[in-house]
């Protein structure tokens, strides 16, 4: 494999010395970019875009052509895994993802099994293709949804505001939910390991909906299964460590518990105080975040002020990857995203080195 020209992102995740704070943005390849919209139109649909190796590579690289980002992230969707389990993923216009065959009957759950990874070969082909296109420019991040977040979509049949169906199952038939979560954990472990084999140099587990759970339920139905995945991941590839990032939106309450599951870094949403988060986790993990995506709707001056506040909050030394606290908004101005990236690089140097 080609030598990595910029490994700042990987070094920061492992708390090794860096010259500046690296940055990438969740959903950096997305609808806020006109070039993404053009490629998406060419593909025909979102799923066709995910499954077309050439076009998935193209949209992954697009933000790097515009911004001086320190990592690329595979263009895909967290719901590829349940789709490979036969649940029939589709996207209704304006409604987001849906499943034709949601898991609402015991008989369906009994039949659920870890999918053959060959059904996800298009994802691994994209990883290999993107690595080739990057040519060592920056590292490539692979990713998956967490077992609980995937289960939310699988049981609800799509997105939800109150998660009544899955919470009813959780409190009345936890045995059924355990079966789904265990299957998901095995599937995600195999899926991320296959991404690493294909060339992913770091991986992130997105627990988008973990924050809707009670304290006890988060530990029992989400964190336990993320720990299971982390324990089963390949941590070395191409002669170097493959860092694992765990991002639980709304998970700021559980940082101490999350810091103990073996991940290299924790993602923070924008509601957390990053300085307090650093004190709470100590030296156990690096931190990633946590600029409010809505702050990109501010002025260039307000964006710079917010960047400075977060960098000051984290303080001196390595172990911080700058990111948004959630995905970039589709209405964000790409020029403001550029100001964000350049400001992080400019202002962070004072916190590193001599």
Swiss-Prot record:
Keywords: Cytoplasm, Decarboxylase, Lyase, Porphyrin biosynthesis
Gene Ontology BP, a term: protoporphyrinogen IX biosynthetic process from glutamate
GO MF, one annotated term: uroporphyrinogen decarboxylase activity
Pathway, per record: Porphyrin-containing compound metabolism; protoporphyrin-IX biosynthesis; coproporphyrinogen-III from 5-aminolevulinate: step 4/4
InterPro entries: UROD/MetE-like_sf, Uroporphyrinogen_deCO2ase_HemE, Uroporphyrinogen_deCOase
Main subcellular location: cytoplasm
Any Pfam family hit: URO-D
Residues the record marks as site: Transition state stabilizer: 77
Binding residues annotated for substrate, in chain numbering: 27-31, 77, 153, 208, 326
Signal peptide start-end: none
GO cellular component terms attached to this protein's record: cytosol
EC number: 4.1.1.37
Catalytic activity: uroporphyrinogen III + 4 H(+) = coproporphyrinogen III + 4 CO2
Localisation per UniProt entry: Cytoplasm
Top-level taxon in the UniProt lineage: Bacteria
Subunit structure: Homodimer.
Family: Belongs to the uroporphyrinogen decarboxylase family.
PANTHER family referenced in this protein's UniProt entry, alphabetically: METHYLTETRAHYDROFOLATE:HOMOCYSTEINE METHYLTRANSFERASE RELATED, UROPORPHYRINOGEN DECARBOXYLASE
Function: Catalyzes the decarboxylation of four acetate groups of uroporphyrinogen-III to yield coproporphyrinogen-III.
Name of this chain's protein: Uroporphyrinogen decarboxylase
Gene: hemE
